[in-house]
Structures are given as structure tokens and as C-alpha cells.
Regions:
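Short gly/ser-rich loop at a beta-strand->alpha-helix junction or flexible surface loop bordering the NTP-binding
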Residues: 1-165, 201, 281-298
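Surface segments flanking catalytic/ligand-binding clefts of nucleic-acid enzymes
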Residues: 1-9, 14, 143-298
Length: 298
């Protein structure tokens, strides 16, 4: 779980010099807003919105995921999602979605004074209700950081019975891999699977004359290495030079016949990733574009 690095005051817009309005009656100073990461902005928004509610509810879904510090993939939802056990149907108001539902024993916790669904309940809600790619991004994250166990998630999902989204959630839990080191790698893995590309080995290590190097993806049958490049990975010129030497050493290995690099733009675009991977020598068995909501085995 992450917290804001420093205290950010939410006030009425008229009290601020250069306000960024969060919603009616709530704003923060622009420099403070611009200093926050996307996740910190989402957390701040949830806290401010919840503070404006007239009745106590339990923060849920993507709003709870923000409080837990979980990554996401789907377009940012700036509405506050809560469970209101008094309702018999979901109600959508100005910036707030009040869901029906019940909170079982152990499914309610308090984060920074805000009633929130437990981590397990939050992850299962995301896995059932968001896109398959979003589900895998979150599941890879919680498995990697040992926040939850696959067996526990599978058991908790089974206990829910035949609820909406249970098949997608089960497929996402089975597909998740703790070795994925970033949301970009998780998204890449899902997109590659939907293109019919064989499952890669993750974080495979190679011994080269320049030393031992670990790669993001390795397809041994095709002899192809795949690397997801984050936007900030090579800002340091020295890091860029080191990476060039690393890639040269890997390309010279006899078992390596292709090398593919891509960014988040390609990772999230089936057609673009298909072009990158096929040019490196990987067989693309399904035509792009393909819906990111399709599940493994479908």
C-alpha cells in the first residue's frame, strides 16, 4: 500500500492562487497537482470525494485499488466507487457510483481513515469487472510483491460461486505471473498471447563474454529475445551506452536469432506489437487487432 509523499491540502477553489478543480467545491494548488504521480492523483481524488459523502459507504473497485496503490490499465475512472449496503440497485450520481452488494467478514478494512474493501476483495472485483489486461496487470503486481497468493485468490473466487465475471477472473488468476516486473511487461504478455504467440520465458538469464544478462522475454524455440522499454529507462547517456553493449553481447550468442524492442504504445496495441514481434522472427498466429478482453484459451 502506498501513501502520498507529503500532505496535500484540498480546499475550496476561491482560497487558492492557481487552483486545479477536483470537483465542485474542492481544489488544490496547481504546482502540488503537477508534482503528483497519476496514482497519487487518484488517491487524492478518492480521499477528497469520500470526505464529501453524506453517508458512510465502503470504497470499492478501482477507487479501492487506488487506495491500495495498485497499478491499472483501463482508462482512468475519476468517479468514486463505493458499496452502499442500504441500496437494492446501483445508483450513479455526480462523480459517485454507489453499488449494491454486501461486505462479508474480513472484507472491510480502514485505509487512512477511509472504509475500504480488503485487498483480496478489491483484486477479485477488478479481475471480474475490468478488462482482462487490467486484471492481469493487478494480479501480476500483487503476486510479484507477495501481497496475495494465487491459491488464496483462486479459493476466494471459487467461494463466490457463479458470479458475473468469474470465468474471466479465474483465467486471469491462472495467467498471472509474479515474474512480470512492470505493468508494461504484463500488458505485453497479454497482447502477445492474444496474438497467438507462444508463452515466453520471463526474466531468462544469458551468460555472455560481457557478463550475465537477464532479459524480459525469451522465446527459445524461435531464438528471439524481447525487451519492454520504459519511457524513463535510458535518460542517463551512460545507461544508454551500457544497454547498447548489453544488446550487442546478447545478439552475438548463437542461440539468439532475433531481438525485439517495444514501448508501452506497442504493448497496448495488438497490431503494432504484432509488427514488432513478427519482424524479429516470431510467428503471429492470429490477425490483429484483437480485443484485449479475450481470455487465454478462448
Amino acid at each position: 500500500m502506498s501513501t502520498l509523499a507529503h500532505t496535500v491540502l484540498v480546499r475550496v477553489p476561491s482560497a487558492l492562487h492557481d487552483p486545479v478543480r477536483l470537483f465542485h467545491g474542492a481544489a488544490i494548488e496547481r504546482p502540488e497537482w503537477e508534482a503528483l504521480s497519476l496514482l497519487e492523483r487518484r488517491r487524492l481524488f478518492v480521499r477528497a470525494r469520500y470526505g464529501a459523502l453524506a453517508s458512510e459507504c465502503v470504497v470499492s473497485g478501482t477507487s479501492a485499488a487506488a487506495l491500495w496503490g495498485l497499478p491499472d490499465f483501463d482508462a482512468a475512472d475519476w468517479r468514486l466507487h463505493v458499496i452502499d449496503i442500504r441500496l437494492d440497485k446501483t445508483h450513479t450520481g455526480r462523480g459517485v457510483v454507489r453499488h449494491t452488494g454486501r461486505i462479508r467478514n474480513g472484507e472491510r478494512v480502514v485505509i487512512e481513515g477511509i472504509p475500504t474493501t480488503s485487498l483480496e476483495r478489491t483484486v477479485l472485483d477488478i479481475a471480474r469487472r475490468q478488462s482482462f489486461t487490467h486484471a492481469v496487470v493487478v494480479l501480476d503486481h500483487v503476486l510479484r510483491f507477495d501481497m496475495l497468493r494465487r491459491e488464496g485468490l483462486a479459493g476466494a473466487l471459487e467461494a463466490l460461486g457463479r458470479v458475473r465475471g468469474c470465468r474471466q477472473a479465474a483465467a486471469a488468476i491462472a495467467f498471472a505471473d509474479a515474474r512480470a516486473e512492470s505493468p508494461g511487461e504484463s500488458i505485453s504478455r497479454v497482447t502477445a498471447h492474444l496474438l497467438g504467440i507462444p508463452a515466453p520465458e520471463l526474466q531468462h538469464e544469458f551468460e555472455t563474454p560481457r557478463g550475465r544478462f537477464r532479459t524480459d522475454f525469451w522465446w527459445p524455440d524461435a531464438g528471439v529475445i524481447g525487451e519492454f522499454d520504459g519511457r524513463l529507462k535510458y535518460e542517463d547517456p551512460r545507461a544508454l551506452w551500457d544497454e547498447k553493449n548489453r544488446e550487442d553481447a546478447l545478439r552475438r550468442l548463437p542461440e539468439v536469432r532475433g531481438f525485439a524492442r517495444w514501448t508501452m504504445r506497442e504493448a497496448a496495441d495488438a497490431r503494432a506489437l504484432a509488427a514488432v514481434l513478427s519482424s524479429a522472427g516470431l510467428p503471429v498466429l492470429r490477425a490483429a487487432p484483437i480485443s484485449a478482453r479475450r481470455q487465454p484459451g478462448s
